[in-house]
A protein has these predicted regions:
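Cofactor-pocket helix-loop regions in the catalytic cores of large enzyme subunits
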Residues: 3-4, 27-41, 95-359
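Extreme N-terminal leader/targeting regions
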Residues: 42-45, 50-51, 55-57, 67, ...
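A short glycine-leucine-enriched loop at secondary-structure breakpoints
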Residues: 9-11, 299
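Short Cys/His-rich metal-coordination motifs, predominantly Zn2+-binding knuckles/fingers
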Residues: 9, 43, 78
Length: 359
C-alpha cells in the first residue's frame, strides 16, 4: 500500500456500495442534523463539498456527485482536514493587545478601537500612511469591499493582494494576446482534447482534483502529454515528453518549440492570417534565434524539444496548463505570452478541447 499511488483521498470509501470500505467520519454523518453545500477553501479548484453538522460541529464532509467542478471527488484535505474548525485554540472573538498581552473584547469595542486608530493615523500622517492587503482566499465581494474601504474611506490607493504576485503575469500576458486574463476553457474540455502541455505546475500536489483528471488523461495510451518542468513531477512519470529544462529558461525553450513548429510547416496558416496580427515580424524574430545557444541555456536536447513541438502542433486539439513555476518569475509575463503564442500559431484557441489555462 505504501508503494502505491494512493493518496488517501477517501474516494473509495464514499463510492463503495457495500460499506466494506468506510471511514469513521462517514459513519458519523447519520448523526448530523444539518447538511450544507459549500466550497472548499484549500486551493483554487473550487470543489463543492457537502458538510454534515450537528450543534455547530462538523461530523463529515463528502463530495457531491452533481458538482460540476469535482463531480464527487475531493482531495484528502478537502474531505478530512476539518478538525481545526472546532479546535479549542481557534479564535472565537476579536482580541486587542494591552500591556503585551492579547485580551478578548467585544465586536463593538474592537470596531471603535479600529475606527479611532485608523482615523488618528489618517488625520495625523495623511491617508497614504495607511495601506491595506487583501487575499485570494477572500470572496470577490470581500475583496471589492476592502479596496472600496481603502480608497473611499481612508482615501488612498495603497491596496494590494497576494494575487498581484502569482496571477498578474497571467492576467497581463493573456490580456495582451487574447484580450482577457482568464482561462480560455473548462477543465471538462479534457474530454475533448488530444494533447496536454503542463508547464511550471505540479497539479497533483497543488490542485489535486484537477491534477487527478490530468493524470487520468496522461495514463491513456492514445493521448499525448507534454510536461515542461525541472522536476520529475507525478505527471512527468506518465508524460510522453518531459522537457526537464533549467529553472528560469521557460522563454528560451518555448522559443525553440515555436521555431520547430514554423520550420516544420505546422502553423495553422488560415487561423494566423485571419485571427492574428504581426506574424511576419514575429516569424523573422523566431527564425533568427540561436538554437545552439538556447539548447545550451535550457539544458534540453533540441531533438526532444522538436519532438514535443511536433506532438503539440499536430494534435487535432491541444490544451496547455501553467502554474506558479511560470508566473512567479521575472519572465512570468513573457512566458505566458509565449504559451499563448503557441496556441495562436497552431489554432488551438476558440473551441472545445483547446486553449490556455492557468492553474
Amino acid at each position: 500500500f505504501e508503494a502505491s499511488d494512493c493518496v488517501s483521498c477517501g474516494a473509495c470509501s464514499q463510492a463503495c456500495p457495500t460499506s466494506a470500505i468506510s471511514d469513521v467520519f462517514q459513519s458519523k454523518a447519520i448523526e448530523a442534523t444539518k447538511s450544507t453545500r459549500t466550497i472548499c477553501t484549500y486551493c483554487g479548484v473550487g470543489c463543492n463539498l457537502e458538510v454534515s453538522t450537528s450543534n455547530g460541529e462538523i461530523l463529515s464532509i463528502q463530495a457531491p456527485y452533481d458538482a460540476e467542478v469535482n463531480q464527487g471527488h475531493t482531495c484528502i484535505k478537502g474531505r478530512y482536514a476539518f478538525k481545526f474548525y472546532n479546535h479549542q485554540d481557534r479564535l472565537d472573538s476579536p482580541m486587542i493587545k494591552r500591556n503585551g498581552v492579547f485580551e478578548k473584547v467585544s465586536w463593538d469595542e474592537v470596531y471603535d478601537y479600529l475606527a479611532s486608530k485608523l482615523g488618528h493615523f489618517r488625520d495625523e500622517f495623511g491617508p497614504d500612511s495607511i495601506a491595506g492587503i487583501s487575499s485570494a482566499r477572500c470572496t470577490n465581494e470581500e475583496n471589492y469591499l476592502m479596496q472600496k474601504f481603502i480608497r473611499t474611506v481612508i482615501g488612498t490607493n495603497n491596496i494590494d493582494g497576494c494575487a498581484r504576485v502569482c496571477h498578474s503575469p497571467t492576467a497581463l500576458g493573456m490580456q495582451r494576446t487574447f484580450g482577457t486574463g482568464a482561462a480560455t476553457n473548462s477543465i471538462d474540455d479534457l474530454n475533448d482534447t488530444n494533447c496536454i502541455m503542463v508547464i511550471g505546475a505540479n497539479p497533483t500536489d497543488a490542485h489535486p482534483v484537477t491534477g487527478a483528471k490530468l493524470k487520468q488523461f496522461a495514463m491513456k495510451s492514445d493521448h499525448v502529454s507534454i510536461v515542461i518542468d525541472p522536476r520529475r513531477t507525478e505527471l512527468a512519470k506518465y508524460a510522453n515528453h518531459h522537457l526537464a529544462l533549467r529553472p528560469g529558461t521557460n522563454v528560451a525553450l518555448l522559443n525553440m518549440m515555436m521555431y520547430y513548429i514554423i520550420t516544420e510547416g505546422l502553423i495553422d496558416s488560415s487561423f494566423v492570417a485571419s485571427r492574428t496580427e504581426g506574424y511576419d515580424a514575429f516569424q523573422n524574430e523566431i527564425l533568427n534565434i540561436d538554437l545552439d545557444a538556447l539548447e545550451s541555456v535550457t539544458g534540453v536536447n533540441r531533438e526532444d524539444v522538436k519532438a514535443a513541438a511536433i506532438a503539440y502542433a499536430t494534435a487535432p486539439n491541444a490544451m496547455s496548463f501553467h502554474g506558479l513555476g511560470v508566473t512567479e518569475h521575472s519572465q512570468g509575463t513573457f512566458t505566458v505570452i509565449q504559451i499563448a503564442d503557441l496556441a495562436l500559431l497552431t489554432g488551438n484557441i476558440g473551441r472545445r478541447g483547446v486553449g490556455v489555462n492557468p492553474l
